[in-house]
């Protein structure tokens, strides 16, 4: 008995499954894996307190019960939240956030496109508008 029909069927199923896989634009010259590491100091002093966890805002990425709080989060982007994060906790959060960056095409980073009004559907809703301070701070991160 020939295994050719079985191989053909397996290949067809594999190809069918692959057609639904999304693609990611990594830019003309994507950086090697693991090298998308914009300035960590800027992350700690600007991105964390002004974009991810701005004081006085009821809705942000990690507000109480927020989608991206590690303890109770409901998404792949889960961050440690504390009044005073230790250096190790900041480092862990930075490593998590950088998985959602696209250094070849920063404007395509899901870390930006999800909360940005009208770009990507986001379970937490739109958090900031194009041209707003959080978006500009994000782009400044790549310029540093």
Regions found by a protein language model. Name each.
Residues 21-144:
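Aromatic- and Gly/Pro-enriched helix-to-coil junctions and flexible linker segments
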Residues 1-21:
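Sec-dependent bacterial lipoprotein signal peptides
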């Amino acid at each position: 008995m020939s295994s050719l029909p079985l191989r053909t069927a397996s290949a067809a199923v594999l190809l069918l499954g692959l057609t639904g896989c999304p693609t990611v634009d990594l830019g003309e010259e994507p950086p090697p894996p693991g090298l998308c590491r914009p300035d960590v100091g800027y992350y700690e002093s600007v991105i964390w307190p002004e974009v991810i966890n701005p004081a006085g805002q009821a809705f942000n990425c990690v507000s109480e019960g927020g989608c991206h709080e590690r303890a109770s989060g409901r998404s792949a982007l889960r961050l440690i939240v504390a009044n005073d994060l230790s250096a190790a906790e900041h480092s862990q959060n930075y490593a998590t956030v950088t998985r959602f960056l696209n250094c070849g095409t920063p404007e395509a980073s899901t870390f930006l496109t999800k909360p940005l009004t009208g770009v990507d559907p986001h379970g937490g809703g739109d958090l900031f508008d194009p041209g707003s301070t959080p978006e500009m701070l994000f782009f400044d991160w790549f310029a540093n």
